[in-house]
Structures are given as structure tokens and as C-alpha cells.
Amino acid sequence: MDLTVINDRGEQVASVAASDETFGRDYNEALVHQVVTAFQANARSGNRAQQTRAEVSASTHKPWRQKGTGRARSGRASSPIWRGGGVTFPNKPNENFTHKVNRKMYRAGLAAILSQLAREGKLKVVESLGIESPKTKLLAGKLKSMGYGKVMIIADAIDDNLWLSSRNLPNVYVVEPHQADPWSLVKFGNVLITKAAIKQFEEMV
């Protein structure tokens, strides 16, 4: 699989050969869906919670006597059928959202996404993304001249200048190959990758 190499103006200047095992796989939609949803599920913090009828702060006084009023019997205001009462089957923070995906499947899904992006022309290669100083304006200007607004940058090594320049850009995500995840690849759509990072991906996937 040949990948397009571009310069600072977004113009194609060369091509680089990449492994078909990593960048030339067929797109497996079911596998990609599985690894993306598993990644999202595993990222959940599990911080949702509701209160049971035992945990709701309410009076334990019986609202009215059991018989003779003509109304339905009622024991206490924390009943789940009352407004402001507890929840019958509440969510709790200790729920386990983990989805297990085998390492081989995860890497195959990652390779399928990279391959599809390469076929669609959304994965481009650059020699390097060196930034002279930690200035957001410098990186934003360079990406704009290359024709990118929203992009995921995969660099073989992230120096302080690149990291500091990118962290205030909401539509720019900078990672090293081992940090790349399927959800971000799908979300950002456009990927800039350095030549050295390609080799790291091939060894990893």
C-alpha cells in the first residue's frame, strides 16, 4: 500500500510504501463497530446513581390510615410509585461496563480503520511536524496551510513544543502510535502520520 506524502502546503511530494497487513486490509464493519463500542464502554467512569426507597430522605410516617379513606393504601412517602420516592431498580456506580476484546481483534480493527482512511485519502504522511516554539498559532497556521481544521496527528515522538502547541486546539489530537485508539480515528476522520510512526504501527499491528 502506497501512502501519500505531503509538504507544509498540503501538496503531494512523494509516496511511501507501507505494509498491506496494517494499511491495506479490507474494511470489516462488524469488527470496527465492536472495537469502537468496546473502547467507549471501557472508558466509562460509572458515576451514575439513583437512590433506592431506603436511601431517599423522607418521613417514615404513614401518609394516611390503612382503611376507611377510600384511597389506595400507602405506607410511606419514599415508595417508588410516589413522586420524589426512590427508584425500584436504581443504577449504581459499581456497575461493570467493561467489554473484553482480544488483543488480536483490537489490532485488526485498528488496522481496518487505518486502511479505510488510507483508501479514502484521509490518511497522509509527513516527514515530521517540528514546531520551532510552543505556540498554538504556529501549529494552527501550519495545519491551515496544509488544509486541515480537524485532524488527528500520530507522531513517532511528541516533543514539548508539539504537545504545548496542540493542547489548546479543540479539533487537534496529538498521540504516539501506541496511544492511538479506534474511536479517535473514526471521530477525527483525517489523520496526519509521520514516516517513523508508520514503522511503529507496522511493528505494533
Swiss-Prot record:
UniProt GO BP: translation
GO molecular function, a single term: structural constituent of ribosome
Amino acid composition bias (Basic residues), ranges on this chain: 62-74
Gene Ontology cellular component list: ribonucleoprotein complex; ribosome
Alphabetic keyword roster: Ribonucleoprotein, Ribosomal protein, RNA-binding, rRNA-binding
Short name of any one Pfam family annotated for the protein: Ribosomal_L4
Biased composition (Polar residues): 43-60
Assigned protein family: Belongs to the universal ribosomal protein uL4 family.
Biological role stated in the UniProt entry: One of the primary rRNA binding proteins, this protein initially binds near the 5'-end of the 23S rRNA. It is important during the early stages of 50S assembly. It makes multiple contacts with different domains of the 23S rRNA in the assembled 50S subunit and ribosome.
Protein name listed in UniProt: Large ribosomal subunit protein uL4
Gene designation: rplD
